[in-house]
Amino acid sequence: MAFDKDAFLTALDSMTVLELNDLVEAIEEKFGVSAAAMAAPAAGGAAGGGAAAAEEKTEFNVVLADAGANKVAVIKAVREITGLGLKEAKDLVDGAPKNVKEGIAKADAEAAVKKLVEAGAKAELK
């Protein structure tokens, strides 16, 4: 049996979303595969365990767990990291535990945690 790719693509193009969904289910059943694993490979890594998920994670949150004894230095560090004004930074420090920065790269997050710890705060990378 000859296979014509152009005819197949034309047939796919004319299908509705429901028909495409049925086709995907039929392919999964026939060949014993899962479309979810192909569509989202990162999701499979997250299900593999905490260590694998931590290695693949690309966005991190910097959490101020406790301001410590030297609140003034911590407020200055928060202002440097976030660009917040004095009142906003003070409110953030007083309301600990709070997220200082969210969704940032690992290197930036580690630098922010280091700066907060050097100022006397307890900070975490999540």
Swiss-Prot record:
UniProt keywords, alphabetically: Ribonucleoprotein, Ribosomal protein
Database matches in Gene3D superfamilies: 3.30.1390.10, Single helix bin
A GO biological process held by the record: translation
GO MF annotation terms: mRNA binding; structural constituent of ribosome
Pfam families membership: Ribosomal_L12, Ribosomal_L12_N
GO cellular component assignments: cytosolic large ribosomal subunit
CDD domains recorded: Ribosomal_L7_L12 (cd00387)
InterPro entries reported in the protein's UniProt record: Ribosomal_bL12 (IPR000206), Ribosomal_bL12_C (IPR013823), Ribosomal_bL12_C/ClpS-like (IPR014719), Ribosomal_bL12_oligo (IPR008932), Ribosomal_bL12_oligo_N_sf (IPR036235)
Annotated disulfide bonds: none
Assembly and oligomerization: Homodimer. Part of the ribosomal stalk of the 50S ribosomal subunit. Forms a multimeric L10(L12)X complex, where L10 forms an elongated spine to which 2 to 4 L12 dimers bind in a sequential fashion. Binds GTP-bound translation factors.
Stated role: Forms part of the ribosomal stalk which helps the ribosome interact with GTP-bound translation factors. Is thus essential for accurate translation.
Family from the record: Belongs to the bacterial ribosomal protein bL12 family.
Protein name in UniProt: Large ribosomal subunit protein bL12
Species assigned in the record: Acidovorax sp. (strain JS42)
